Amino acid sequence: MAVYEILKMGDPVLREKAKPVTRFNSNLGRLIDDMFDTMAAARGVGLAAPQIGIGKRVCVVEVGKRRFELVNPEIIEAEGEQCDAEGCLSIPDYTGRVKRFQRVRVKAQDRKGETFIAEGTDLLAVAFQHEIDHLDGILFVDRVENDNPEE
C-alpha cells in the first residue's frame, strides 16, 4: 500500500468540488486502501481524496473501531447541534470551534458500488460532515465560530 502526501491549505485542489465516482474497479479499491494507510500514518480520523490531490468523491473515516469507506456520500438526514474543537490534516497545528450537526445519516456507496446508509453521532457525525465538506471544497476554517465577537 502507498502513503500519499497530504496537501496543505493553500493548494487549489482543496477548494475544488470533487467529481462523482462512476467506475467501481480495482483502482478505486487500491485508492481506498491507500487512503486508510495515509490517514493512519498521519494519525487522523478521516481523509478525503482531494486532500491527496485526487478530485473524486471518496473519503474514509475511522472512529474507534468503526471504519467507513464512503464513495459519493451525501448527508440525507441531520439533527441536533454540537460545537467542538476541530482540526484537519491539511491545516496542521490549528484547531477551531465548529458548529456541526450532532447526528447525521449518510447515504454512500462502497468500493463495489453497493449503496448503504451510515449513521453517526458525536465525533463520528463530525468526521462525516468534515470529510464531505472536503469533497465540496470547504475547509473547516470556513466554518469556525468566532469565540470573541468583539474581534
Curated annotation (Swiss-Prot):
Protein EC: 3.5.1.88
Cofactor note text: Binds 1 Fe(2+) ion.
GO biological process: co-translational protein modification; translation
Highest taxon, organism lineage: Bacteria
Pfam families xref list: Pep_deformylase
KW Hydrolase (keyword) present: yes
EC class name: hydrolase
Signal peptide limits: none
InterPro entries assigned to the protein according to its UniProt record, in alphabetical order: Peptide_deformylase, Peptide_deformylase_sf
Catalysis performed (reactions): N-terminal N-formyl-L-methionyl-[peptide] + H2O = N-terminal L-methionyl-[peptide] + formate
Residues involved in Fe cation binding: C88, H130, H134
Residue positions of the active site: E131
GO MF annotations in UniProt: metal ion binding; peptide deformylase activity
Keywords tagged on the record: Hydrolase, Iron, Metal-binding, Protein biosynthesis
CC cofactor: Fe(2+)
Described function: Removes the formyl group from the N-terminal Met of newly synthesized proteins. Requires at least a dipeptide for an efficient rate of reaction. N-terminal L-methionine is a prerequisite for activity but the enzyme has broad specificity at other positions.
Family: Belongs to the polypeptide deformylase family.
Record protein name field: Peptide deformylase
Organism: Heliobacterium modesticaldum (strain ATCC 51547 / Ice1)
